[in-house]
């Protein structure tokens, strides 16, 4: 079970990349979206997100306990789920995918209120939820821009 949690939490090892593993994972999700995932119906896309969130919460709880850290740097399933949500219903052009990526990474790294506070939720739920809130910030901001331009 620990091996499954480790592979899930680290997105099959992407989390072990020495430089910016969260950014690498987000970039990988952008490429998956750009070339494949945008074709999914929105209910199925959201179902995948919910499944990834629940699986990530479970795996992150086990993995963080095994690493004896609250939020191990190598646990990047939260970035995968967050980036997936930030891309929801976005037209898969390079400019919009890149904008979603930059906004999500900004909010995930800077963690303005209330994102930082959400991290304090227990175990894997806190690991996952701050990225979901960062994704909501990114998605809302990008969609507001698109509505107002």
Kindly label every feature range from the protein language model.
Residues 36-50, 114-125:
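Membrane interface segments of multi-pass transport proteins and intramembrane proteases
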Residues 36, 91-92, 113, 146:
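Short alpha-helix boundary/capping motifs
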Residues 14-21, 42-45, 143:
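Alpha-helical transmembrane segments and their cytosolic membrane-interface
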Residues 143-149:
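Juxtamembrane boundary at the C-terminal end of a transmembrane helix
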Residues 38, 42-56, 61, 73-77, ...:
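Alpha-helical transmembrane segments and their juxtamembrane interface "caps"
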Residues 28-41, 84-90, 142:
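Interfacial segments of multi-pass membrane proteins
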Residues 1-25, 58-86, 106-136:
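Interhelical loop and helix-boundary elements at the membrane-water interface
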Residues 24-28, 43-50, 94, 98-102, ...:
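Hydrophobic alpha-helical transmembrane segments
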């Amino acid at each position: 079970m620990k091996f499954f949690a480790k592979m899930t939490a680290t997105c099959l090892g992407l989390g072990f990349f020495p430089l910016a593993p969260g950014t690498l994972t987000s970039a990988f999700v952008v490429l998956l979206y750009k070339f494949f995932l945008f074709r999914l119906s929105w209910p199925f896309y959201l179902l995948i997100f919910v499944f990834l969130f629940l699986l990530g919460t479970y795996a992150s709880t086990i993995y963080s306990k095994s690493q004896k850290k609250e939020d191990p740097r190598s646990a990047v399933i939260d970035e995968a789920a967050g980036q997936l949500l930030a891309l929801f219903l976005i037209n898969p052009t390079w400019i919009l995918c890149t904008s979603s990526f930059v906004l999500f990474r900004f909010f995930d790294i800077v963690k303005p209120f209330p994102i930082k506070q959400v991290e304090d939720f227990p175990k894997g739920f806190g690991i996952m939820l701050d990225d979901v809130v960062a994704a909501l910030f990114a998605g809302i901001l990008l969609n507001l821009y698109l509505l107002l331009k």
